Structures are given as C-alpha cells and as structure tokens.
Amino acid sequence: MASKIKNGLSDTTLRKSSSTSLRVPRLTRIVTKPDSNSPSPTQQQSRLSFERPSSNSKPSTDKRSPKAPTPPEKTQIRAVRVSESQPQSVQIKEDLKKANELIASLENEKAKALDQLKEARKEAEEASEKLDEALEAQKKSLENFEIEKFEVVEAGIEAVQRKEEELKKELENVKNQHASESATLLLVTQELENVNQELANAKDAKSKALCRADDASKMAAIHAEKVEILSSELIRLKALLDSTREKEIISKNEIALKLGAEIVDLKRDLENARSLEAKVKELEMIIEQLNVDLEAAKMAESYAHGFADEWQNKAKELEKRLEEANKLEKCASVSLVSVTKQLEVSNSRLHDMESEITDLKEKIELLEMTVASQKVDLEKSEQKLGIAEEESSKSEKEAEKLKNELETVNEEKTQALKKEQDATSSVQRLLEEKKKILSELESSKEEEEKSKKAMESLASALHEVSSESRELKEKLLSRGDQNYETQIEDLKLVIKATNNKYENMLDEARHEIDVLVNAVEQTKKQFESAMVDWEMREAGLVNHVKEFDEEVSSMGKEMNRLGNLVKRTKEEADASWEKESQMRDCLKEVEDEVIYLQETLREAKAETLKLKGKMLDKETEFQSIVHENDELRVKQDDSLKKIKELSELLEEALAKKHIEENGELSESEKDYDLLPKVVEFSEENGYRSAEEKSSKVETLDGMNMKLEEDTEKKEKKERSPEDETVEVEFKMWESCQIEKKEVFHKESAKEEEEDLNVVDQSQKTSPVNGLTGEDELLKEKEKKKKKTLFGKVGNLLKKKGPVNQK
C-alpha cells in the first residue's frame, strides 16, 4: 500500500497542481479537529514552514482553471469505503428491526396481558357487584326483619302498657268495691257492737229494775211493819208481785238464757261469718288474683294468638324470603359456579400468564443478553454508521456545493456570452463531474460497508504517510523543492480532511450510540415499570380473588345462619303452640276454679244474708223484750206510786186516829202483841223472798256474767284499748251498785231494828201508862176499822191488778 501511495503521489503531483483550485475551497470549509494520530511538534513546525510557501503558492493555484477532473484513486477509495460500510449498516438496521420487532412483540404481549388483566378485573368487578347486590339484598332483608321485629316489640309493649293501665283501672275499681264492702262490714260490725251495747244497757236497766224492785219490796216491808192492818194485804200483794215477778224473772231468765244461747250462737255465727268473711276475703283475693291471672292468661293467650299469627305471617314471609333466598342462593350458586369457572379460567389464565411472564422474563433475560451483545454490535455498527453518515453528509455537502457552483456557472453563462465555448466545455465537464459524483455517491454507499477495513487501511496508511511525510519533509528541507512542498501541503490537507471526516463520523456514531443506549434504558425502565405494575396487578387480583372467596364463604355462612334462624323460628312457633295449648288447659282449670269459688262465694253470701236475717230477727226480739221491760218498769213505777199514796193515806189515817184513840191503847195491846209475830213472819217471808230474789238475781247475774265473759274473751282480740277501758268502767259501776245494795240492806236492817226497839218500848210503856179496858175496846174498834180499810184497799188493788195486766 505504501508503494502504491508513493507511486500515486509521484503520478498525481502534476495533476494535483491543476486540481488544487477546486479542492482547496472544499477543504477550507471543513472544520479541523485534533486527532490521536496527529503529528509531533516537529511535524507542526514543518507544517508551518510548509504553510508559508503554500500561502505564496495560492494565487498560482487560484489562477488555474477549475475544470480539472478529480483523481480516480480517491473515487476508488471512497467506493471501497461505501461498499464496506453498506453491509454493516444493513446488518445494523436488521438488528434494529429485530430489536424493534421484539419490543413490538413484547408490547403486544404486554397489551394482551393488560387486556386479560382488564377482562379479569371486569369479571372480578362484575362478581363483586353481584356479591354487593346480594349483600345489599341480604342487608335490606335483615334491616326489614329487624324493623319489623322492633315494630312488633313496640306494638307489644304498647299493648302491654295499655293492658296494664286497664288492669290498674280494674284493680282500682276492685279496691273501691272492696273498700265499699269493708265499709259495709264495718257498719255491720258497728251495728253489732251497738246491739251488744244495747244488750248491756238492757242488762243494766234490768239490774236497776231489780234493785228498784228490791228497794220497793223493802220499803213495802218497812211500811207493812209500820202499818199493821195493811200487812196481810201487803203480804198478799207482795206474794202476787213476787209471783208475777218470779214469773217475769223466770220468763226473763228463760228469755235471757235463750238470748244468751242465741247470742252465743250468734257470736259463733259471727265468728264463723268473720272466718267466712276472712275466707271470702282470701277467696276474693284469690279470685282477684285468679281474675288477674285469667286476664293475664287471656292477654297472654291473645298475645300468644297475635304472636302466633305474627309468627305464622313471619314464618310465611320467612318461607317466602327463604324461597327468595333459595332462589338468590341458586342464582348466587349459579353465579358462584360461573364465577368459580371464570376464576378457574382466570386462574388458568393467570397461571398461563405467570408461565408466560416467566417465559417473558427468560426471554427478557435473553433479550438483555442479546441487547448487551447487540449494544456492543450497535456500538460498532454505530461507529461504522457514523463514519458512513459523515461521508454521506460530506458527499451531500459536496453536491450542494456543486449545485451552488452550477448556479454560479449559470450566472457566469449569462454574464459571459462571449465565452460560450468555454462555458459549454465547462458545462460538459460539470455534467461529467456530476455523473462522476453520482457514481461516487453510489460507490460511497458501497464504501460505507467497507469502512472498517478502510479505517484500518487508512490508519496504516496514515502511519506510513506520516513516516513518509517525515521522510519527505526531511528531504524537502534538504532539497527545498517547491513541488514536494505542494505535494506535502496537499497530503496535509487530505490528511486533515480525512481526520475531520472520521472525527465527525465518530461523533455522530457516539451520538447515535448514546441515543440507542438511552432508548434501551427507557425500554428497560418501561419494562421494569410494566413488570412492577404486572406484579401489583397480580397481587391485586390474588387479593381480590381471596376477598371474593371470603365473601363467598361469608355468604355461605350467612345462608346457613338464615337457615338456622328459620329453623329456630319454626321451633319457637311450635313451642308457642305448645305453650298456647298449656295456657288453654290452665285457663280451663282456672275457669273451673273460678266457677267453684263463685259458687262458694254465693253460698257464703247466702249464709251471710241468712245470718243477717237471724240478726234482724234477734234484734226485733230484743227490741220487743226491751219494750216489755220498759212496760214492766212503768208498771213497777205505777205500783210504787200507788204504794206510796196508800202509805201516805195510811199514815194520815193513822195520825188522825192516833189522836182519837189514845185512850184505847189497852184494847189494842193484843193486836200489838200479835204485830211483832206478823212483822217477824212478814220479815221472814220478806227476807226469804229477798234471799230467793237475790239468789235468783245472782244466778241470772252469774249467767249474764258468764255470757259477758265469754263474749268479752272473744271480743277482746278485736277490741281496741278504748273498749277495754269501757269494760273496766262498767265493772267499776257494777261494784258500786253492789256496794249500794249492801248499804241499802244494812240501812233497811237498821230501820227494822229501830222499829222493833220502838215496839218493845211501846210494850214496855204500856203497863207504865196503865191502860184500861176501855182503851182495849177502842183498840179493837180501830182494828175493825183498819180491817175494813185494808179490805177496801185490797179490793181496789185486786181491781187495778187485772186492769194493769190488760
């Protein structure tokens, strides 16, 4: 190659001198850059030394004609370079196409995977929407069920409150009735107490009447002692009175005994009535409780019926809901089957996608390996492409320059009509040069494929040229020939031009390599982000599938729970029916007990009415007895008044006759002798009658006291402390009455003793006075008169006795 270049240089020295006029302006336009293969400082100095004469030689070159043709060796080198660079660029383009196709296939697979993911998402969203709809329907059914439950509970509470209010009102009515009944019972007890008080008053009146009768008998006995004549008739009257009194006392005692027995019976009846009343109260309480229980049972039965109806309705509704739920469950099962199928399909797709992803990962790894290898190839091809592109750009610039020159030539044609021949020749030459340039462009394309070899050959040629240039410089320095200087300058210019071209090609190749590297990095980043998104979507799909499975399991659990609830409701309905039957049986039993208690109440009320009737009869009898006692008291008062009148009349008569018959004391001594016996007899009879009366009174008092003690013992439990004080006062009053009786007996005994003393003194004074027979006659006359008077008084008393009895 070096010999060829030397021969070419020797052959082309003459030609270059003619063609420098065309090349110099081209080379001056190219920007020079420092190269690694640049010459040493000695070479730079030689260049400076050579540049000075080149500046001097420029006008000579400018004066040359620009119509000199280009050398054929350069065109051959360019054609070789283009031919070498073209297959490399084709391979690089094919590799780029393959890489782009792989990237497009990856993007298509990525788009397919994204579409599948979108479809799976859509399916999952549809399944989730279906599940949400099912859950919403279930929630709505549960909310409706809870609302209905709440409404039923509120209605039950309101009904219970109303029934409680009604029961309270009924209880108040029953309490009012009970209060009224208790008030009536209190009135009855008060009436009974009043009756007992009246009985006690009657007993007191009876005792007072007896006391008065005793007083009257004693007074009568005293008057009989004083009145001798009326003693026999008074004895008769006393006997009659005693007989009547005895009869009355016997009748009264019998009545009192009967009344006592009846009172005892009445008290027993009262006790029985009270016990019956207590039992009745207890029965009433039991009946009230039973009524309350009945009402509660009825209410419970009505509630149970209502609840049973409601539960039946609810059971029907629940059955409907169960049917709907079963339908929904079937739909859900169908949808679940479809969803499971879809999930299986999606799972299979996911597995396929995962396998594809693994394959893609492997492919990506392989692609990365290939990309790494291709990067190296790309770097190399980019270097080649850069060189070829630089050359093509330079050729394009040259073509542009040629166009500009053509324009200038055309202008010169218009300006220089005189030089038509030169212009035509120059045009022909330019056309030939055009053809050559076109051929050179075609050859440059071919040379692009062979740029590597040319670069290597150029590098070796550069080294050789540099060595030769050094040698030539040395020779030129020694010789100082101008031809060699021009050749060296031309070589320097060619070397600079080639260096600039290769530097531009390298820069462009580096730039393209950087662009490709950035594109590859961006594709890597996009692929990594796509992988991350893919993994995130895979995780989201897995989570969504898990959530879907959990929701399906929860739906199954809720369906099972609803089935259990329906079973429980059925069991509760059966239990409620059983409770209703039991409540009905209990209600029947309670109704039977209530009927029995009502019958017992009626019987007790009838007995109480009978007892009240008996009490009324006894009260009427008691009132009649009291009325008879009042009549007897009136009779006694009348008899006492008559006795007092008779005694007063007798005393007046005795007082009148005593004055007249002072002289007849002797005649009446016998009578006075008889008077003590009569008085004693009358006193004995009086005492006996009084003792009998007192014994009878004591027996009656004992009976009454026993009856009173029995009644008091029975009534002590029910009486208050005030009643006890009344009893104490009554006993004190009786003791005072007894003491008065004893004092009265003592006083009467003292008066009798004084009368006896007076009689004894009169007997003693009779002999002292010296009564004669005339006095005795007068006494006998007085006795006869007294007898006549006593007879009249007896007849009057006999006449008045039956009248009073009538």
Curated annotation (Swiss-Prot):
| Gene Ontology CC terms | chloroplast; endoplasmic reticulum; microtubule associated complex
Biased-composition ranges for Low complexity?
9-22
Transit peptide positions?
1-78
Ranges for region Disordered: 1-94, 380-403, 684-725, 746-777
| Ranges of Basic and acidic residues composition bias in the record | 391-403, 685-699, 706-725
- State the superkingdom: Eukaryota
Specify whether Nucleus is a keyword of the entry.
no
Sorted UniProt keywords = Chloroplast, Coiled coil, Plastid, Transit peptide
Cellular compartments annotated: Plastid, Chloroplast
Q: Which residues form a coiled coil?
A: 88-530, 585-662, 698-757
Query: Where does this protein have compositionally biased stretches of type Polar residues?
Result: 34-59, 759-769
Report if keyword Glycoprotein is assigned: no
Tell me the protein family, please.
Answer: Belongs to the WEB family.
Q: What is this protein called?
A: WEB family protein At3g02930, chloroplastic
